[in-house]
């Protein structure tokens, strides 16, 4: 199970300033707590063995310094956990009407069985202004032993949205796919989930916007042609269809 909780700001009426919207902070502290609890409840209802969260804030201006990590830990107390900070900004004085402020955000992986090792891998990012909203992009690699001596290797990823030249996107994909392929070639089981910041299915902007195609600029088509042999993607979550 994977979910980007969006620093627990995205109520139905929230519009983020970097997507052409208005707000740079969540609506209120109460709204943040309500959103993180709702996310935890929804995920818990599905009883997943593995959970991959992105944009989990702690001590951030935009989410009123609420520790969303601690709330998730309390919701899944029996699960093993791996955290990695992938967004740290001392203070962003933009937008001027409501500065984004200081930000700390992480990716959190939960597992119902023990994790024997984990690694954080830094991704290449833009060097322009957008890097101030795209700091420390990374993915985590978590290792879970199996009965046959192989490992289940979980990749929790959050790729760039706003940085995004074609070169940066390609470099991030090549790095991720290279690490996944290396594990697959060792005979390990490999699962990758997270926020790719791409149009993963080919019609995701339409599905998520009431049937209307919407151009977000950053939601480029997922480069399925870059997938190495042996790796597949699931692009239809209803019937479990897997497309090579």
Task: For the regions a language model picked out, list residue spans one by one.
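Active-site beta-strand/loop signature of hydrolases that rely on acidic residues for catalysis
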Residues: 2-5, 38-65, 110, 142-144, ...
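Conserved beta strand-loop-helix elements of the APE1-like EEP
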Residues: 74-77, 101-118, 145, 243-244
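Metal-dependent phosphoesterases centered on the DNase I-like endonuclease/exonuclease/phosphatase
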Residues: 163-244
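Surface-exposed cleft-lining segments at the edges of enzyme active sites
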Residues: 22-29, 56-58, 123-131, 158-169
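Solvent-exposed loop/turn segments at secondary-structure junctions
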Residues: 5-8, 57-60, 86-90, 115-116, ...
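N-terminal, active-site-proximal structural segment of metallo-dependent hydrolase catalytic domains
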Residues: 1-78, 83-104
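A SAM-dependent methyltransferase catalytic signature shared across enzymes that methylate proteins
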Residues: 73-82, 111-119, 221-236
């Amino acid at each position: 199970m994977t979910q980007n909780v969006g620093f627990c700001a995205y109520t139905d009426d929230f519009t983020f300033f970097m997507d052409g919207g208005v707000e740079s902070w969540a609506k209120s502290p109460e709204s943040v707590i309500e959103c993180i609890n709702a996310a935890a409840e929804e995920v818990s209802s599905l009883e997943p063995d593995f959970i991959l969260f992105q944009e989990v804030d702690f001590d951030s201006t935009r989410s009123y310094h609420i520790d969303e990590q601690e709330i998730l830990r309390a919701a899944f107390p029996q699960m093993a956990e791996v955290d990695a900070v992938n967004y740290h900004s001392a203070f962003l004085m933009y937008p001027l009407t409501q500065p984004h402020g200081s930000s700390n955000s992480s990716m959190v992986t939960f597992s119902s069985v023990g994790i024997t090792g984990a690694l954080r891998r830094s991704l290449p990012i833009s060097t322009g202004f957008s890097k101030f909203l795209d700091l420390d992009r990374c993915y985590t690699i978590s290792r879970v032993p199996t009965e046959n001596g192989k490992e289940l290797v979980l990749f929790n990823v959050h790729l760039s949205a706003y940085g995004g030249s074609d070169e940066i996107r390609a470099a991030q994909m090549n790095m991720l796919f290279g690490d996944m392929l290396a594990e697959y070639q060792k005979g390990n089981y490999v699962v990758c989930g997270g926020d790719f910041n791409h149009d993963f299915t080919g019609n995701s902007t339409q599905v998520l916007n009431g049937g209307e195609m919407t151009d977000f600029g950053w939601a480029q088509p997922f480069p399925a042609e870059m997938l190495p042999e042996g790796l597949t993607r699931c692009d239809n979550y209803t019937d479990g269809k897997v497309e090579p």
